[in-house]
Structures are given as C-alpha cells and as structure tokens.
Amino acid sequence: MIPLSWYMALATVLFCIGVAGFLTRRNIIVMLLSLELMLNGVNLNLVAMSYFMDSLRGHVFTLFVITVAACEAAVGLGIVICLFRSRRTVRNDNIVELRG
C-alpha cells in the first residue's frame, strides 16, 4: 500500500506546478489549465486524507469541488472565447479593460 506521505507529496507538486504556471504564463487558457491543475492537487489531497481516515467527507467534498471546477472552466472558456472574438488575442497583457 502506498503511504499517505507520497499522496501528499504528489498533491503538493501538482499544486505548486499549477501555481507556477498561473503566475508565469500570460495566456489566459494556460492560466485556466493551471488553475484546474491546482484544484486537482487539492482534490487528490482531500481523497487521500479521506481514504486514510476512513471517512467519506473528503470524497463528497471532492465531488463538489469537481462540479464547481467544471462550471468555472465552462464560464472561463466562454469569457475567453468572447475576448478572442472581440480583441483577437488571449494574452492578459493585451487586455486592459473588460468593457465591450
């Protein structure tokens, strides 16, 4: 059986890669993917802790986080599509205002 510390280390690495990608990239789509990677790291942490503590609370909360992440991705991609249609770019350096 894989020890809990390995799951925690993997979740931390996933979260840190997501944070690094979110802070260093200027493409909004890559920033959304990095945000999803951070949420997946948190989900892995929740599921691992829940499994090792013999509780279903972490699993249930993870389902809610996955649902919210899917909604966030859909809304975020919708906004990115609208920005690309109006400004022809998805770099956040070139977008200074959200007014249409």
Swiss-Prot record:
UniProtKB keywords: Cell inner membrane, Cell membrane, Membrane, NAD, Quinone, Translocase, Transmembrane, Transmembrane helix, Transport, Ubiquinone
Biological process terms in GO annotation: ATP synthesis coupled electron transport
Main location: membrane
Keyword hit for Membrane: yes
E.C. code: 7.1.1.-
GO terms of molecular function: NADH:ubiquinone reductase (non-electrogenic) activity; quinone binding
Gene from which this protein is expressed: nuoK
TM spans (from-to): 2-22, 28-48, 64-84
Family membership: Belongs to the complex I subunit 4L family.
Lineage, top ranks: Bacteria, Pseudomonadati, Thermodesulfobacteriota, Desulfovibrionia, Desulfovibrionales
Subunit structure: NDH-1 is composed of 14 different subunits. Subunits NuoA, H, J, K, L, M, N constitute the membrane sector of the complex.
Family matches, as Gene3D superfamilies: 1.10.287.3510
One GO cellular component term noted in the UniProt record for this chain: plasma membrane
Subcellular location: Cell inner membrane
One Pfam entry name: Oxidored_q2
Enzyme class, spelled out: translocase
Catalytic reaction(s) noted: a quinone + NADH + 5 H(+)(in) = a quinol + NAD(+) + 4 H(+)(out)
Protein name in UniProt: NADH-quinone oxidoreductase subunit K
Function of the molecule: NDH-1 shuttles electrons from NADH, via FMN and iron-sulfur (Fe-S) centers, to quinones in the respiratory chain. The immediate electron acceptor for the enzyme in this species is believed to be ubiquinone. Couples the redox reaction to proton translocation (for every two electrons transferred, four hydrogen ions are translocated across the cytoplasmic membrane), and thus conserves the redox energy in a proton gradient.
Membrane topology: Multi-pass membrane protein
